[in-house]
Amino acid sequence: QVVGTLDCPVHAMNLEQAIFMVRRCYPDHVIVAVDASVGRSEHVGCVTLGKGALRPGLGVCKELQAVGDIFITGIVGGCGSCDPLMLQSVRLSVVMRMADYICDSVRQALVPEPHNFCRRVL
């Protein structure tokens, strides 16, 4: 189940309600939280995966409830002065390409195709 889309996003104003709904409807499920993030300039375009909760809003100095058991982030901008307008300048095409990559990667991990054990990268 996907919660949060372009048409119906999860954001600071509805985050707590979304977390409550997910925990109530899927109490024994692992929650994978996915978000765009800021990081070191040389890491822009990288995807991170880790164990533990995602802390949304940290890049813009917001204190929001942590979410998830596993997190995936796409680094879309360099960290700086906690300026919320900085993320407004990120090209949507960058975010969409990273979202497509993350989606394809999760799908391949959960529903592997037969004989899809390796992929040529060079």
Features from the language model and the residues they span:
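N-terminal catalytic or cofactor-binding beta/alpha core of small enzyme domains
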Residues: 1-31, 36-122
